[in-house]
């Protein structure tokens, strides 16, 4: 292409971008924000290395509701507890759409629970919640699975006693096995190739999506499709994960008994058979594969990442670790594993777990939302179809809700009588209509794993506690703890 042709192409792109920008502005009364450039939008004001920090700084200048342009696309950004709560909870239906997230959408194509929308999302979510409840989510039966998996983890950790190790893979295998048992019908041995492959794909993709490459792809997907980089590996991983799930689905089809479903896949296949004559049915192979992927991804990475944050925090603050262990010894003792019934008798431990989730803020910007209709909001009119970013980080670090938000402080979740105190600004699983459907399972896992490990081990860092850096490595999709090793000593 010669220079003249290139110039003409760039001019056309600029005109198209400007027309899209101004047409989108004209559809409603959008909140203020930094002035966008043609094609680039607000790219110059948004550091791809740390989009969260950039948006948080802009909120201080433009207020709790403002507009940024990701390329030519306007996106509303909400910050602070009151604003986010008003959108996700008070106006839950209007803000219940799923916003554009090309990193995922180019794989899921709008199928599955996490990235579907409208009636399809409502039907899939209702079905998935019911099936997960039938298989014990939030009940004693799933607690027994967690206790069993926790005991396997403790066996592995005892073999590591006194030896430095990286906890990433050990935790991921154990946590993933719980959701695998619900989805596939049975747990895997820790050296099973299928489990190891699942963990590799999920861990690697979470890192990429939480990196600048992931952020840039979400802004300029059509451009980065032509550029080499880690995002290419991300889609290869997605494809490998899809193939693995499809293989398991075929195995289920060969042995399916509709009258005796063994797991989530069996239930979905049975529903597909029941609605196979309905051309409008949302139960098909694509939605099964993507829904299964969503469950595995969500049920593996966030809990494992939160536990790693907890390890770092407890090693940096050994007095907190010792106080938790004292409460465990007093309430549970050493002769049995902690159970969920113990939680109400362990207010300090419960407060520490909640404070870990608040402070670590694993999903700081939430998944994007979208307004489902023209929506009046705080003096503005947000047009139907506009994407919305809710900065959960600004909720968890809201000084009006937490006394010392920049510090790790379990007192945030304790009242004057040292009883556990809930906070309405606690939103690690989001809030409203799009609340993570795996929240009950994740909360159970966190409590049982956290208490079981501290009942049996003391965590020791390889460096001086004062030198432990709690600043997350990434602030994209997820806040990842910095890589570390530790020693566990049997108590």
From Swiss-Prot:
Q: Where in the cell is it found?
A: Endoplasmic reticulum membrane; Microsome membrane
**What family does this belong to?**
Belongs to the cytochrome P450 family.
Its function? Involved in the regio- and stereoselective transformation of naphthalene to trans-1R-hydroxy-2R-glutathionyl-1,2-dihydronaphthalene in the presence of glutathione and glutathione S-transferases. It specifically catalyzes the production of a very reactive and potentially toxic intermediate, the 2R,2S arene oxide, that is associated with necrosis of the unciliated bronchiolar epithelial cells or club cells in lung.
Swiss-Prot/TrEMBL cofactor(s): heme
Residues annotated as signal peptide:
none
Species of provenance? Mus musculus (Mouse)
EC nos? 1.14.14.-
SUPFAM superfamilies, per database record: Cytochrome P450
One GO biological process term? response to toxic substance
Which tissues express it?
Club cells in lung and liver.
Which InterPro entries does this UniProt record tie to the protein? Cyt_P450, Cyt_P450_CS, Cyt_P450_CYP2_fam, Cyt_P450_E_grp-I, Cyt_P450_sf, Cytochrome_P450_fam2
GO CC entries: endoplasmic reticulum membrane
Assigned keywords, A-Z: Endoplasmic reticulum, Heme, Iron, Membrane, Metal-binding, Microsome, Monooxygenase, Oxidoreductase
Question: CDD domains from the xrefs?
Answer: Cyp2F (cd20669)
UniProt superkingdom: Eukaryota
- Molecular function via GO: heme binding; iron ion binding; oxidoreductase activity, acting on paired donors, with incorporation or reduction of molecular oxygen, reduced flavin or flavoprotein as one donor, and incorporation of one atom of oxygen; oxygen binding
State the membrane topology. Peripheral membrane protein
The entry marks the following residues as binding heme, namely 436
What's the gene? Cyp2f2
Protein name in the entry: Cytochrome P450 2F2
